[in-house]
Amino acid sequence: MADKSDLNALSGRFRGYYPVVIDVETAGFNAQSDALLEIAAVTLQMNKEGWLLPDETLHFHVEPFEGANLQPEALAFNGIDPTNPLRGAVSEHDALHAIFKAVRKGIKDKGCNRAIIVAHNANFDHSFVMAAAERASLKRNPFHPFATFDTAALSGLVLGQTVLAKACLAAGIPFDSSQAHSALYDTLQTAKLFCELVNRWKKLGGWPLPAAESE
């Protein structure tokens, strides 16, 4: 029989993956050519009863890499002025180095094997993280090179909504549209949403799996 404490551990919930919620704000849609301007990450924890909860938060404004495209439409959409000195922006290297270091520690502390990005429309955020890590020559990237947990897809299944704000409201999570398109706010709300989706599945009896309980 499977040890219930293992099933209630973060390492046992997602096949050894350590989920980290990420959101990025950018100056366009092309991860290779357009600037990464802001990134936030929220790590997750599981309590002894097996409920998923947000843990630590990291947030950085990021300097555009040399030669980066800055699409005016994207800047108008997210309201970011890359030239504003009050942003306190750091290099892609410094931002990702700090996030990767915290994530590697979380992997070790939680007994997991590798990190996996959780994001809303995750391919977008994943592509920018991977491109920035390559530009910064960061060799110890803890994230899976292509697998993700996409809260847009999960919300479509569970809640019938795919837009972050609408999914949060459908899940009973307040969403302030005036704060949307801030990487920090969107990451915090996405983390709450992912936890709600995972925990709701548990409440409905979907986890632990019956087969796991009867082994």
Swiss-Prot record:
Cite the binding residues for Mg(2+) 2.
Answer: D23, E25, H181, D186
Task: List, alphabetically, the SMART domains matched.
Answer: EXOIII (SM00479)
Which InterPro entries does the entry link to?
Exonuclease_RNaseT/DNA_pol3, RNase_T, RNaseH-like_sf, RNaseH_sf
Recorded GO CC terms: cytosol
Active site at H181
Q: How is the cofactor bound?
A: Binds two Mg(2+) per subunit. The active form of the enzyme binds two Mg(2+) ions in its active site. The first Mg(2+) forms only one salt bridge with the protein.
Its EC number(s): 3.1.13.-
Domain Exonuclease intervals: 20-194
Residues marked Important for substrate binding and specificity (site): F29, F77, F124, F146
Gene Ontology molecular function: any one: RNA exonuclease activity, producing 5'-phosphomonoesters
Alphabetical list of HAMAP family matching this protein? RNase_T
Q: What does this protein do?
A: Trims short 3' overhangs of a variety of RNA species, leaving a one or two nucleotide 3' overhang. Responsible for the end-turnover of tRNA: specifically removes the terminal AMP residue from uncharged tRNA (tRNA-C-C-A). Also appears to be involved in tRNA biosynthesis.
Q: How does it assemble?
A: Homodimer.
**What's the protein called, per UniProt?**
Ribonuclease T
Q: Which gene encodes it?
A: rnt
